[in-house]
Amino acid sequence: MNELSSVDWSRAQFALTALYHFLFVPLTLGLSFIIAIMETIYVKTGNERWKKITKFWLSLFAINFAIGVATGIIMEFEFGTNWANYSWFVGDIFGAPLAVEGIMAFFLEATFFAVMFFGWDKVSKKFHLISTWCVAIGSNLSAFWILVANGWMQYPVGMQFNPDTARNEMQSFFEVALSPVAISKFLHTIGSGYVISALFVMGISAWFILKGRHIIEAKKSLVVGASFGLVCSVFLFFSGDESAYRVTQTQPMKLAAMEGVYQGEHRAGLVPFGILNPKKTIDNNESVFLFDITIPYALSILGNRDPNSFVPGIEDLIHGNEDRGIEPMQERIDKGKIAIQALKDYKLAKDNNDTAAMATHKSILEANFKDFGYGYLEKPTDAIPPVALTFYSFHIMVALGSLFFLLFIATLYLTMANDIEKFRKILWLCLLCIPLGYIAAEAGWIVAEVGRQPWAIQDLMPVHIAATELGKVNVQISFWIFAVLFTALLIAEIKIMLTQIKKGFDAYAGYSTLMGKGEK
């Protein structure tokens, strides 16, 4: 077994931080809107029971929000400590949306969070309601700007490389912010957060019904959660369709890994279920699947909006396909090396004040810059992501998403029919789907990030070039420190939440409840 390098440990540390952080983010995104909806019902009806319900869910939101912020701050610092080359190469672009997020979105939600949490009976009902909606909007604005940054890494646009500084510089902020890849990534990510939040509300409400406690409040919460989840599941279906389309156009290797496509084909079928052959590689003729179910034409429709279109496979992207205008990977690597050498020659000519040579080398660099990152790959197969992990993560995400959609329909129907108590298996399934929701979301992020390997920035910078040159021991130590810290934070959140949940709706779930002085 190969020993892990410093870069591998840096990747593992960032993956650890991101996956832990994303345990908290989805609940913040969706639960904030669910709380706002519940409080709107309270303000419209004046029913104090809805106030009780709102304050209960607000207390759980506050716990999750605080710990989510802590893990997010650590992740931002890792860009500078573990990925200094990346920060230098694209900091001018990547930092802009993060700065806007801090100035606009985070301060919006932080300001109104205090009013939302501590302002009960201190400000008017309408102002408190406005504050709650501002927190929900601010939380989702934060997600937008962060996902704009991530979307740019997947599809870099709106910039120009400056050979004098060896940095990419922003040319169009709006092209970066309104990139179709960034927009589709934002919509799909917040959609998953909304579904997780709906499952969270449904699961806890189901627990109360199973225990025979707070039946009225639990049923009302169940209706809101299931309704919200059903609408968001439909939204998630369409945003996922758009996301897959964008991946096909901008990251064909990722799509090939997602669906286990080795040989490209016209009228390509979609595999909703399959077992990959572990012996299959690009260099042999083994079957791709040990078992699979295929829907004809579906992948061509999903990827190109045309049932007769061609979907390239891994072999096409590595060996090339002249008929489809796909360059062999080795040619892209060669062009990348030409671009890298042209940059070196440009700097040397600049040191010698040779303007003619500078112009020549700059021209060569610009002609080959789109393949710049490929010059750092040792061999064509380095451009292939981990196929099995990407494939199974994608299919787990889709399968669980389909399950959630059916659960929302069943739960909403049975609750509205006032029969939900009779279907205890459905209630237990609601409870079980809380962790399953997080598994689906984490699987989605694995698809997004593992599926684009080896790239830190698509086509421009591989991960091993983006990393800071750190001693392996230093990264190992920080990895285990973060692993222990994040695990402790997760355990603390779960423990505090369970304590709060056990208090029930009658505690009113205001700020005083967290201090042990809940209203009775």
Region roles according to the model:
Residues A149, V231-I338:
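Aromatic-rich transmembrane-lumenal/periplasmic boundary elements in polytopic membrane proteins
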Residues F113-K122, F127-W133, F144-M153, F173, ...:
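Internal alpha-helical transmembrane segments
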Residues V25-I34, M104-F112, G193-I204, I396-L412, ...:
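Hydrophobic alpha-helical transmembrane segments
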Residues N64-C134, G151, V450-Q453:
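Membrane-interface helix-loop-helix modules in multi-pass inner-membrane proteins
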Residues T45-I63, F89-G95, A99, G119-I137, ...:
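Membrane-interfacial loop-to-helix junctions in multi-pass inner-membrane proteins
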Residues M1-L19, G46-I53, F77-A99, G151-L187, ...:
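Membrane-interface interhelical loops and short amphipathic "cap" helices
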Residues A62-A70, W133-M153, G229-G240, C430-A448:
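Hydrophobic alpha-helical membrane-insertion segments
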Residues D382-W445, Q476-Q500:
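C-terminal substrate/ligand-recognition segments
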